[in-house]
């Protein structure tokens, strides 16, 4: 293993976060997810390869959500009435694994899966949500606020618009955030 002797790891050039880096992340993740979806569809049997492909799609979705949503607008939605300085946690309103499965079975496009609803919840409400059966599932994907309604959680959009969770559905989400969804 002499070939590793004298190796000096080069630090990557820092990338300035902003529009160009968010767009690059979106395009990279979209291309890779499309590639993995095609690989998945070519499989003849649900085996370890299928599991690894699903895992890779999960990683790419979460990477995009963390970088291009969480680091950009914080989340699509915010729990209403949080006092300034309240510790919040980033939450997938529709669990990421559900979005992945919807994508694999042609119920969502890649752009839609990349932009599933996300929310900043207080740590207290997030723990409460996770302590129920609703932590990693949802009773209704289209009416995705049902799991929040059961806990009395109200929300606004990231730019302060009040959301009526009884009428705001997945179509409302994608219509409101259409400028966040790129279709390159």
Residue ranges and their predicted role:
Residues 66, 96-100, 124-128:
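Amphipathic alpha-helical interaction surfaces
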């Amino acid at each position: 293993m002499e070939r590793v002797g004298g190796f000096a790891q080069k630090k990557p050039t820092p990338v300035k976060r902003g529009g160009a880096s968010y767009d690059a992340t979106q395009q990279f993740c979209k291309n890779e997810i499309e590639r993995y979806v095609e690989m998945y569809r070519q499989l003849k049997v649900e085996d370890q390869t299928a599991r690894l492909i699903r895992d890779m799609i999960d990683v790419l979705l979460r990477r995009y959500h963390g970088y291009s949503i969480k680091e950009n607008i914080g989340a699509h939605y915010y729990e209403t009435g949080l006092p300034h300085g309240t510790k919040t946690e980033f939450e997938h309103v529709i669990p990421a694994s559900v979005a992945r499965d919807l994508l694999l079975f042609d119920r969502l496009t890649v752009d839609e899966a990349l932009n599933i609803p996300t929310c900043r919840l207080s740590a207290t409400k997030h723990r409460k949500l996770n302590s129920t059966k609703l932590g990693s599932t949802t009773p209704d994907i289209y009416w995705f606020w049902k799991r929040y309604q059961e806990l009395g959680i109200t929300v606004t959009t990231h730019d302060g618009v009040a959301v009526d969770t009884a009428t705001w559905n997945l179509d409302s989400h994608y219509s409101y955030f259409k400028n966040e969804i790129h279709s390159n």
